[in-house]
Amino acid sequence: MTSIRRLIAIAITPALFMATSCGRHSTSEVFYLIAANLSLPYWKTAETGFNAAAARYRVTGKVAGPDNYDPQAELQELNHAVAAKPAGILISVADEGLLKPGIDAAIAAGIPVITIDSDAPSSRRLFFIGTNNLDAGHLGGERIAERLGGRGNVVFYSMPGQPNLDERLQGYKDIFATHPDIKIIDVVNIKGDARNAFDNTQQYLAQTGVARVSAFICLEASSGKVVADAVRRQKITDRVVVAMDVDQDTLAEIKDGTIEATISQKPFTMGYVGLKQLDEIFHNMPKSLSKDYSVDAFAEYPVFIDTGTALVDKANVDVYARSAADHQ
């Protein structure tokens, strides 16, 4: 099922209008945030940031995309958005090969496009806002290597082909390359359904001897809590689980000790800064949107805005839990 939400900016008084220096803005300026898996808490947080920026700038924000992991449905929403000729599009790319033509079509139509969360560097998008996913993988890989003492079998849960997840996997591989006794025995494609992670974890927990799995690594947000649940149900306490993102369930599993650590991202910031950047571009359009600004040393646009990552474990989980509670 596809969901679409709309924020209409509230009219302001002339005095406030002048005080906020927003005279150039209008609710007729429509910006889109497009992503797959909108039902995830991660995207609820990104939407909150996007809408907060829309409210601040007195513009209209629309959030569109499938509630589940469906790149084809995301493409349909992108095509609908391009046809509507909005002021700008912010998009998380579930499948670069599939979505690249739509992104390029938007740019060709004079619509600024910025990617967030998951990039499409081969497209004509202007730049990327989000996590340094290689660094995220390095953080997790270092913790796994430390906890395993440099030896053991590991299983990943991912959705191969999604650019940000592939980059995180590469980050882990970079670290494991210096620990040759850490073996990756599987990268499970959960296909957008965390239940696949649960089922596979149960099967891998039954393996013993040289096939024993010592660690489970979740490269996306939904798998962590179900992997932890599978481990808990079998009353196993000697396996390492590393998750992704800081939803309440994941933080609770860290407090419980079932999840060793998670890698935090800043989806609110991605949504907020994304709309802010689109607004600036819309009101100061370059001579050419299709130019490759990444190779221009004098470009007014960055290649990448890093919104930050951090490793969250028992030592700092309460800080993240309080922050989440403050923003509910």
Give the positions of each predicted feature:
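Hinge/cleft segment of the Venus flytrap/periplasmic-binding protein
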Residues: 175-176, 275-328
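Short beta-strand elements in bilobed, periplasmic/extracellular small-molecule ligand-binding domains
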Residues: 55-68, 153-158, 173-194
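Hydrophobic alpha-helical segments within soluble ligand-binding/sensing domains
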Residues: 74, 129-154, 166-167, 195-198, ...
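Extracytoplasmic "Venus flytrap"
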Residues: 30-57, 61-80, 84, 92-96, ...
